[in-house]
Regions:
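Short, contiguous, helix-prone interaction/anchoring segments in small proteins
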Residues: 26-33, 44
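Glycine-rich hexapeptide-repeat left-handed beta-helix
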Residues: 1-14, 20, 42, 48-77, ...
Length: 148
């Protein structure tokens, strides 16, 4: 175990012994990391309100930020989830076996269902659901960033 592991308001991160935490990752407050997870460089999990949980065998790649909402929304990452570099997961639910692309954003109350995919750069707006097989390109749950 490595990185900044810091308590906040009486809650301390709980990390499975088999998890990898990069030396400059930060886990703050009510954060739970499951077995065989990997939390890569410059990733921040800030459980300064409701908690954050990351299920076993999931990996949060470099620069990912996971945060909660002051109004009681947790952030949950299921089992066997891959979260690409620089993604932002804010007070949302990512179910088992999902994939979040690089630089994607998933906002408050959104749900990415088991086995679903969110494309790189996509934004899943608050309260939306990304369904398995639909992906974030179906227009119902995500908006694509403007280009040029």
């Amino acid at each position: 175990m490595s990185g900044l592991i810091a308590p906040f308001k009486g809650f301390a991160p709980r990390i499975a012994a088999s998890a990898f935490i990069a030396p400059n990752a930060a886990l703050i407050g009510e954060v739970e990391i499951g077995a065989n997870c990997s939390i890569w460089f410059s990733t921040v999990l800030r459980g300064d309100g409701p908690g954050i949980s990351v299920g076993e065998n999931s990996n949060l790649q470099d620069g990912t930020v996971v945060h909660v909402a002051a109004r009681g929304l947790r952030a949950t990452v299921g089992r066997n989830v891959t979260v690409g570099h620089m993604a932002l997961l804010h007070a949302c639910e990512i179910q088992d076996d999902a994939f979040i692309g690089m630089n994607a954003t998933v906002l408050d109350g959104a749900v990415v269902e088991s086995g679903a995919m969110v494309a790189a750069g996509a934004v899943v707006t608050p309260g939306k659901v990304v369904r398995r097989g639909g992906g974030s390109s179906d227009g119902s749950a995500a908006r694509w960033p403007r280009c040029c």
